[in-house]
Amino acid sequence: RKIVYNSYDTQGNITQYTPENGLPVAIIWGYNGQYPIAKIEGITHDIAVSKLKDYLSKLQNGTLSDVEQKALRLLIPEAMITTYVYKPLVGVTQITGPNGISENYTYDYANRLEEIKNDKNEVLKTFQYNYKN
């Protein structure tokens, strides 16, 4: 399947791609350009940035509230929006899909993935690490 990479930011991060015979997909980057914080399927990057301008700062530093997450999705009803929150240098801590349902990721003292929980705080998956001497 062919994909056209339409645009990049000044740090070389992909900001928009279009699958063959498909709709554009915008990627918004945060945490000083280190991590993708939103994938918006169905509109261009320029339109996404324009429509989300009031939320970009909070989205880019991971401080968007649950209420703001919902409002963000209502701004662009024609698009499917997935958002990501990170603990820098560790990993993703929350992924919220287009349906508004979140998965939360927790890490142990050594920054290894420990659990994945749903938005009702129910454990979906646990990880154990065993080392052999």
Could you describe each region identified by the protein language model?
Residues R1-P19, L23-G97, S102-N133:
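Beta-strand elements of repeat-based all-beta scaffolds
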